[in-house]
Amino acid sequence: MHTVRIPKVIKFGENALGETEYPKNALVVTTVPPELSDKWLAKMGIQDYMLYDQVKPEPSIDDVNAVISEYKSKNPSVLIGLGGGSSMDVVKYAAPEMKKEKILIPTTFGSGSEVTRISVLKVNGKKTSFHNDALLADVAIIDPYFINSAPFEIIKNSAIDACAQCTEAYDSKNGNSYTKFLCNKAFDFLEKGVLNDDKEKIVL
């Protein structure tokens, strides 16, 4: 028997950010400075929210505890992980602890963290991978807006990451016909996105 676990809702495509209605009093968790997060939040069209932007790269359980300690009493309606894997990993773990739903919005691509049941956090200085259905997003929003303005180096690394993830998933002993179908479609999209018009030279 095979089991496929995915978020309750996945919204993807151009303008997915702006066409989503966000609950009032949401807590947005990110790693980026205000000059960038302000631009992203304006694109989202979110009005009533709290912002926590102190998450560090490669976060630890201490980052999770800091979010819970500061915001649990403020009773946010939902936690929104906006950014790379660091902010999403923190929200994945913190939201169940606060008994709140979570929205994950990746600003890069490649790992697919927004649709997995995995959160990677440092515990006592050591990276630890947590696996649990409670870590799945309630809503994942994937919008190409972020990639259009991303530095080339991030696009390149994300594309390489996506290729590696697809290859690993396709060859996984836990794979099945459904996951292999998704991998094949991903390879098709990657070929179109990574190769240039003459199909001979890799843009990367």
Question: Predicted segment positions?
Answer:
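A short, small-residue-rich loop immediately preceding and capping a beta-strand
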Residues: 71-94, 98-107
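A glycine/threonine-rich phosphate-anchoring loop and its flanking beta-alpha core
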Residues: 97-181, 185-186
